[in-house]
Amino acid sequence: MRQSSETEIKLPVPDLAAVRRKIRSLDFIKVVPRHFESNTLYDFRDLRLRTSRCVLRLRRANRQWLLTFKGPPAASLLYKSRVEMETLVADGEQLHAILEELGLKKAFRYDKYRTVFAPRLPARGACGALLVLDETPAGNYLELEGPEAWIDRTAERLGYRREDYITASYAALYRNHCEARGKVPADMLFKTRGD
Protein backbone atom coordinates (compact mmCIF):
# COMPACT_ATOMS: atom_id res chain seq x y z
CA MET A 1 0.00 0.00 0.00
CA ARG A 2 1.17 3.50 -0.79
CA GLN A 3 0.18 6.50 1.33
CA SER A 4 1.13 10.01 0.38
CA SER A 5 -0.10 13.54 0.22
CA GLU A 6 -0.91 14.79 -3.26
CA THR A 7 -1.19 18.36 -4.50
CA GLU A 8 -2.69 18.84 -7.93
CA ILE A 9 -4.68 21.01 -10.30
CA LYS A 10 -6.45 20.42 -13.59
CA LEU A 11 -6.18 22.65 -16.65
CA PRO A 12 -8.61 22.70 -19.59
CA VAL A 13 -7.23 21.50 -22.93
CA PRO A 14 -9.13 23.07 -25.84
CA ASP A 15 -6.64 21.80 -28.47
CA LEU A 16 -5.26 18.31 -27.86
CA ALA A 17 -2.70 18.37 -30.71
CA ALA A 18 -1.33 21.76 -29.62
CA VAL A 19 -0.89 20.70 -26.00
CA ARG A 20 0.88 17.49 -27.06
CA ARG A 21 3.34 19.56 -29.12
CA LYS A 22 3.87 21.91 -26.17
CA ILE A 23 4.54 19.00 -23.78
CA ARG A 24 7.18 17.62 -26.18
CA SER A 25 8.81 21.04 -26.53
CA LEU A 26 9.13 21.37 -22.73
CA ASP A 27 11.28 18.24 -22.44
CA PHE A 28 8.82 15.96 -20.68
CA ILE A 29 9.19 12.22 -21.14
CA LYS A 30 6.30 9.80 -21.49
CA VAL A 31 6.43 7.44 -18.50
CA VAL A 32 3.08 5.70 -19.06
CA PRO A 33 1.75 5.46 -22.65
CA ARG A 34 -1.82 6.40 -23.51
CA HIS A 35 -4.17 3.82 -22.02
CA PHE A 36 -7.85 3.36 -21.20
CA GLU A 37 -9.02 3.67 -17.59
CA SER A 38 -12.37 2.63 -16.16
CA ASN A 39 -13.09 4.24 -12.78
CA THR A 40 -15.85 3.55 -10.25
CA LEU A 41 -16.49 5.76 -7.23
CA TYR A 42 -18.20 4.15 -4.25
CA ASP A 43 -20.25 5.68 -1.47
CA PHE A 44 -22.80 4.73 1.16
CA ARG A 45 -26.51 5.32 0.53
CA ASP A 46 -26.37 8.45 2.72
CA LEU A 47 -23.47 9.80 0.57
CA ARG A 48 -21.26 10.28 3.64
CA LEU A 49 -18.05 10.05 1.60
CA ARG A 50 -19.19 12.71 -0.87
CA THR A 51 -20.51 14.90 1.98
CA SER A 52 -17.14 14.71 3.74
CA ARG A 53 -15.36 15.30 0.38
CA CYS A 54 -13.64 11.91 0.50
CA VAL A 55 -13.27 9.51 -2.43
CA LEU A 56 -13.15 5.73 -2.63
CA ARG A 57 -12.27 4.71 -6.18
CA LEU A 58 -11.68 1.39 -7.90
CA ARG A 59 -9.77 1.81 -11.17
CA ARG A 60 -9.03 -0.70 -13.89
CA ALA A 61 -6.17 0.17 -16.22
CA ASN A 62 -3.72 -1.96 -18.17
CA ARG A 63 -5.30 -5.16 -16.81
CA GLN A 64 -4.64 -4.04 -13.23
CA TRP A 65 -7.03 -2.99 -10.47
CA LEU A 66 -6.14 -0.15 -8.10
CA LEU A 67 -8.14 0.84 -5.01
CA THR A 68 -7.66 4.45 -3.89
CA PHE A 69 -8.93 6.38 -0.88
CA LYS A 70 -8.59 10.16 -0.93
CA GLY A 71 -9.19 12.14 2.24
CA PRO A 72 -10.88 15.54 2.33
CA PRO A 73 -8.91 18.28 0.55
CA ALA A 74 -7.15 20.94 2.58
CA ALA A 75 -8.60 24.44 2.41
CA SER A 76 -7.06 26.10 -0.65
CA LEU A 77 -8.48 28.19 -3.45
CA LEU A 78 -5.78 27.27 -5.99
CA TYR A 79 -4.66 23.69 -5.35
CA LYS A 80 -6.24 20.44 -4.28
CA SER A 81 -4.10 18.86 -1.56
CA ARG A 82 -5.17 15.71 0.23
CA VAL A 83 -3.98 12.43 1.70
CA GLU A 84 -4.12 9.57 -0.79
CA MET A 85 -3.81 5.86 -0.01
CA GLU A 86 -3.81 3.25 -2.74
CA THR A 87 -3.12 -0.41 -3.24
CA LEU A 88 -3.18 -2.90 -6.09
CA VAL A 89 -6.06 -5.37 -5.95
CA ALA A 90 -5.85 -8.88 -7.37
CA ASP A 91 -9.56 -9.24 -8.20
CA GLY A 92 -11.57 -6.07 -8.75
CA GLU A 93 -14.85 -7.93 -9.31
CA GLN A 94 -14.48 -9.70 -5.96
CA LEU A 95 -13.58 -6.42 -4.26
CA HIS A 96 -16.72 -4.85 -5.74
CA ALA A 97 -18.79 -7.63 -4.13
CA ILE A 98 -17.03 -7.06 -0.79
CA LEU A 99 -17.67 -3.31 -0.92
CA GLU A 100 -21.36 -3.94 -1.63
CA GLU A 101 -21.56 -6.33 1.33
CA LEU A 102 -20.14 -3.51 3.47
CA GLY A 103 -22.96 -1.22 2.34
CA LEU A 104 -21.13 0.72 -0.37
CA LYS A 105 -22.72 1.25 -3.78
CA LYS A 106 -21.45 2.47 -7.13
CA ALA A 107 -21.91 6.25 -6.98
CA PHE A 108 -20.34 7.32 -10.29
CA ARG A 109 -18.44 5.66 -13.12
CA TYR A 110 -16.17 7.47 -15.53
CA ASP A 111 -13.86 6.61 -18.40
CA LYS A 112 -10.78 8.34 -19.64
CA TYR A 113 -7.71 7.83 -21.75
CA ARG A 114 -4.64 8.83 -19.80
CA THR A 115 -1.03 9.53 -20.77
CA VAL A 116 1.51 10.25 -18.01
CA PHE A 117 4.62 12.41 -18.44
CA ALA A 118 7.44 13.39 -16.10
CA PRO A 119 10.06 16.12 -16.39
CA ARG A 120 13.22 14.74 -18.00
CA LEU A 121 15.25 16.63 -15.40
CA PRO A 122 13.06 17.35 -12.34
CA ALA A 123 13.64 20.71 -10.69
CA ARG A 124 15.00 20.74 -7.16
CA GLY A 125 12.22 19.68 -4.79
CA ALA A 126 10.02 18.43 -7.64
CA CYS A 127 11.06 14.78 -7.71
CA GLY A 128 7.97 12.69 -8.45
CA ALA A 129 6.14 15.58 -10.15
CA LEU A 130 3.86 14.46 -12.97
CA LEU A 131 2.04 15.97 -15.92
CA VAL A 132 -0.98 13.89 -16.92
CA LEU A 133 -3.06 14.26 -20.08
CA ASP A 134 -6.63 12.99 -19.63
CA GLU A 135 -9.09 12.60 -22.50
CA THR A 136 -12.66 12.28 -21.18
CA PRO A 137 -16.15 12.22 -22.71
CA ALA A 138 -16.65 15.71 -21.22
CA GLY A 139 -13.45 17.30 -22.51
CA ASN A 140 -9.69 17.04 -22.19
CA TYR A 141 -7.62 18.12 -19.21
CA LEU A 142 -4.07 18.31 -17.99
CA GLU A 143 -3.37 17.39 -14.40
CA LEU A 144 -0.25 18.76 -12.78
CA GLU A 145 0.75 16.92 -9.62
CA GLY A 146 3.67 18.02 -7.47
CA PRO A 147 4.83 20.89 -5.27
CA GLU A 148 2.86 24.13 -5.65
CA ALA A 149 5.87 26.07 -7.00
CA TRP A 150 6.47 23.39 -9.67
CA ILE A 151 2.77 23.42 -10.60
CA ASP A 152 2.85 27.21 -11.03
CA ARG A 153 6.04 27.17 -13.13
CA THR A 154 4.86 24.31 -15.30
CA ALA A 155 1.40 25.80 -15.86
CA GLU A 156 3.02 29.10 -16.89
CA ARG A 157 5.41 27.32 -19.28
CA LEU A 158 2.38 25.59 -20.83
CA GLY A 159 0.71 28.97 -21.37
CA TYR A 160 -1.77 28.89 -18.48
CA ARG A 161 -2.47 31.34 -15.66
CA ARG A 162 -3.65 30.70 -12.11
CA GLU A 163 -7.14 31.76 -13.22
CA ASP A 164 -7.19 28.60 -15.37
CA TYR A 165 -6.63 26.25 -12.41
CA ILE A 166 -9.42 23.76 -11.73
CA THR A 167 -9.72 21.82 -8.47
CA ALA A 168 -13.10 20.20 -9.20
CA SER A 169 -13.36 16.43 -9.51
CA TYR A 170 -14.25 14.71 -12.77
CA ALA A 171 -17.69 13.96 -11.29
CA ALA A 172 -18.28 17.68 -10.63
CA LEU A 173 -16.91 18.68 -14.05
CA TYR A 174 -19.22 16.17 -15.71
CA ARG A 175 -22.26 17.43 -13.77
CA ASN A 176 -21.43 20.97 -14.94
CA HIS A 177 -20.90 19.72 -18.52
CA CYS A 178 -24.32 18.03 -18.54
CA GLU A 179 -26.14 20.95 -16.91
CA ALA A 180 -24.69 23.37 -19.49
CA ARG A 181 -26.17 21.15 -22.23
CA GLY A 182 -29.53 20.55 -20.55
CA LYS A 183 -28.75 16.86 -19.98
CA VAL A 184 -29.36 14.80 -16.87
CA PRO A 185 -25.96 13.68 -15.55
CA ALA A 186 -25.36 9.94 -15.27
CA ASP A 187 -22.05 8.12 -15.63
CA MET A 188 -19.29 9.70 -17.75
CA LEU A 189 -18.61 6.88 -20.20
CA PHE A 190 -17.43 6.76 -23.79
CA LYS A 191 -20.04 5.39 -26.19
CA THR A 192 -17.50 2.78 -27.26
CA ARG A 193 -15.44 1.62 -24.31
CA GLY A 194 -12.09 -0.06 -24.76
CA ASP A 195 -9.10 -1.41 -22.94
Language model features with spans:
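N-terminal strand-loop-strand beta-hairpin
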Residues: M1-G128, Y160, D164-D195
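Short, well-ordered alpha-helical microsegments
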Residues: L16, I151-D152
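A short beta-strand motif that forms part of the nucleic acid-binding face
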Residues: G71, P137, E148
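A contiguous pocket-lining binding segment that forms or flanks enzyme active sites
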Residues: L131-A138
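A hydrophobic, small-residue-rich beta->alpha segment in the mid-to-C-terminal subdomain
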Residues: A149, A155-E163
